[in-house]
UniProtKB/Swiss-Prot annotation:
Belongs to the acetylglutamate kinase family. ArgB subfamily. The gene is argB. GO terms for cellular component: cytoplasm. This is Acetylglutamate kinase. It comes from Methanosarcina barkeri (strain Fusaro / DSM 804). Disulfide bonds: none annotated.
Length: 322
């Protein structure tokens, strides 16, 4: 409040003396001063950033996101990128005459869909992100769960659901669950100044590829790396109590809230794996997880380095000690 008051007095008293550009420079300086304690707190810490396909709606937005991530590296933070690619996979499937199907926010993945997913995630999106990191002045390196057997998993069992009162099994195909994250290769990459870019393709004991939701992978990797934060970027402003009302934004969610909100139908569709990924991370030592709108310019910097924040924060509620 005192900063705001001083700024108002300054503007009123000196607005005729100084140019608008000079005032703007002073405001920028205030932004840097506000960011300083956060930069000090986060220095040398690991942050896992999941960049969703829905956040990559344009080349300019993607460039802004990567610039922000490269900036984090330059101020001493160690970012790890996990990328999705759902819209791109769906688009590619459509061009190949195949319909995308989902169950509880997870893509049903038969053999053909698995091949398409690998083609899009590893051969297209991953290489584009690594290239863009280089253009923005950083050093990126592309990885999958195969590399160093980093992400080991198993195929999910068929799901039992009630359809018209009849219990039915739904086989979601090569959709996997993480068993083990081997972070050794990530530590090596980070210590050498690189930004790892991870496609969410895991491997099972027989060498089969598994499609694992990128939000879940990001949560598991954040936990394995003992990351300071997990950031999940999407195309909405965090969690909304009413999907049709942008003013129903929920700014904070505890682990205890998540199951209740899923049961109430507040958390549904693609937001379910996001909150589950956040919950896994926070349960396993990550201080906080943040769901933010990646299509808002520099939203990640606003969430990390300002007092206000703009997304939904997931944290572990600790009861006060008596």
């Amino acid at each position: 409040m005192w900063r705001l008051a001083i700024t108002r007095v300054f503007n009123d008293k000196f607005k005729n003396r100084f140019s608008d550009s000079y005032i703007m420079e002073l405001k920028r300086e205030n932004v840097l001063i506000e960011a300083l304690p956060y930069m000090q707190e986060f220095y040398d810490s690991i942050m896992v950033i999941k960049v969703g396909g829905n956040a990559m709606v344009s080349a300019q937005i993607m460039e802004d996101i990567i610039k922000d991530i490269v900036l984090l590296r330059y101020v001493g933070i160690k970012p790890v990128i996990v990328h999705g690619g759902g819209p791109e996979i769906t688009e590619k499937m459509g061009r190949m005459g195949k319909k995308a199907e989902f169950f509880q926010g997870l893509r049903i993945t038969d053999d053909e869909t698995m091949e398409i997913a690998k083609m899009v995630l590893v051969g297209n999106i991953n290489t584009k992100i690594v290239s863009l990191i280089g253009v923005c002045g950083g050093k990126g390196i592309g990885l999958t769960g195969y590399d160093g057997r980093m992400i080991l998993g198993h195929k999910q069992a068929a799901k039992k659901v009630l359809i018209n009162g009849i219990e039915t099994e739904v086989d979601i195909g090569w959709v996997g669950e993480c068993e083990v994250i081997n972070p050794d290769i990530l530590h090596i990459v980070l210590e050498n100044g690189y930004i790892p870019v991870i496609s969410p393709i895991a491997v099972d004991a027989k060498g089969n590829a598994l499609n694992i939701n990128a939000d879940i992978v990001a949560g598991d990797i954040a936990a394995a790396l003992h990351a300071k934060k997990l950031i999940l970027m999407t195309d909405v402003s965090g969690l909304l109590r009413d999907m049709n009302d942008p003013n129903s934004h929920i700014s904070r969610v505890t682990l205890e809230d998540i199951d209740h909100l899923i049961a109430e139908g507040v958390i549904q569709g693609g937001m379910i794996p996001k909150l589950k990924g956040a919950a896994v991370a926070v349960k396993n030592g990550v201080e906080k997880a943040h769901i933010i709108n990646g299509s808002v310019s520099h939203s990640m910097l606003l969430e990390l380095f300002t007092d206000r924040g703009i997304g939904t924060m997931v944290y572990k509620f600790e009861k006060p000690k008596n």
